[in-house]
Amino acid sequence: TPSFLRRIKDEEKKEMVEEYQRYLAEKGKRVQSFVKPKSEQGVPVLFGSDPEVNLVEYDSEGETKIVAGMIYNAPNSHRSWNETFRDVKRMRDEEKKKVVDAYLSGRTQRWQKVGRAFENAYARFEILVNIGAWRDIHRHRMLSQQRQNFSCFHGYDVPPEITESGIEGQFRSAIGRVEDIFSKIVKHDPDLAQYAVTLAHRLRFMQWENLRQSFWQIELRTIPEGHPDYRHLCQKKFLLLEKVYPLIAPYMRTN
């Protein structure tokens, strides 16, 4: 709740604030009855060591829209979007590439952001990764993210350092105790049960993003200094984008 609402002294207005808080807090519970039972949701992942990344939605005309966006606000452009888009649709791939080359000419560093033309195409990713990696990835704001509850339903990752240290058995034993506690709490309160989940457990979430944000996130999160978990995640995102946006993806400065 915004801090200025928490400072309200008027009792009637306080009640309005509380109603607003309940509205926000309980929206998930209001749709619980529409969710299929666990047995119908598919077989959970048991153990994992690599992020699972799927591209579930993209724009088949996305690259055409991006190129049209580049031309649309050129200093001498005064034609409508529909006219510009129609012209670009008639272009051959080589012609489109020349436009992109010109638009990005001089970009030599990842911190040199690509322009708003790249916001004309979107992609939706569904990701399964340990909560520790998600905590880094979810901080990106120029995209929409929806996560499911923290849980023990999707398995967990065993960091290689744990195995190398010879304590994998102890690690798995501790995880087992955590999962026993989780299974008892989740029957009564799925929200409260989230506090019993470790950062090693896997979380399923979605990212709905425009290609400008894809450039920023993938270029930043694949640098060699980054954590292997989110590096692998973003490398997989890049490989998926490369298949559906073959004109645009190669311009990403991916490691």
Where are these predicted regions, by residue range?
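A conserved ligand/cofactor-binding region detector
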Residues: 1-255
